[in-house]
Amino acid sequence: RSATPLALRPGSYYALAVDLARKGCTVGLCDIGGNLLQCRELPEQSDMTDAIAGALASLLESVDRRKVLGIGISAPGPLDCENGRILNPPRFERWHGMDIGKRLSDALGLPAYLEHDVCAMALHQRSTGQSLNFMLLFIDIGIGAAIVSGGELLGNFTGELGHTTIRFDGRLCECGNRGCLETYASIPALLEGSGFRDWFDLVNQAHDPEARRLLDQEAVYLSAGLINLLNLIPVDSIYLAGDICCRHELLVERLRREIGGKALYRGRNETRIFPVADTPNMGILSAAEVVFSRFFTV
């Protein structure tokens, strides 16, 4: 007989979500249908963890507490996700060593789940059902990647692609190593000394010879890191996220040529490269998906 599509009823379960980013902190309440019901940006305060707990407690009052599965927290890495602790992410010093999971769990009486922000985005991308075998590549002030293979997030892959080495005697990185991909291919590193203010300025002047040179250079740098991963874990698709998505086609064609000419599996199926959908509040929706993915699978 014909198959019957099934879906979870949106109001059946909820998740509290916390998106910790270098640009600020956002909290929200989401339902299992992927709907953002409430969202608040929190101003900088002396004790941000207490402020987050207070904001979440306020959100919790609007729904049946028994239907709230937990608190999802996304943050830049490196992290100790198992113990809910933020370790020592660069340019994130105020959060170093913070047991954010335990503090929020104790304050609200709900389980809390910490996840690398790029891995959380990959879980959200998986929930769209577009692909179950992909890499999500985030490029902005840093670089991160997460891999979903056979529908499963590779949990032993921490997302720190930006701190893989592409030149053993290269530039000194904030992590203490030399030659990290991030020191060459993050947007600030790429544009340093170029005269372009940001990525948007660069792509809006894509006709400029210097802009074309930088786009070519970015593709070369990124391919050096990506090919190492693709040779180990081939994927069908790469999804781009971050500011790099603006005028993504300028980079995608260059990147496709670089990867296609060097990857071990060239000539098999070409790896497709797409931007992630332009989803408002993706960070907070991704943090909520960290919770839902613990209870429901694709």
Language-model features: locations:
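Short, acidic, Ser/Thr-enriched surface-loop or helix-capping motifs
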Residues: 31, 81, 148
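Short, active-site-adjacent cap segments at secondary-structure transitions
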Residues: 78-81, 119-122, 144-145, 154, ...
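ATP-binding/phosphotransfer module of carbohydrate and carboxylate kinases, centering on a glycine-rich
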Residues: 1-67, 128-129, 172, 177, ...
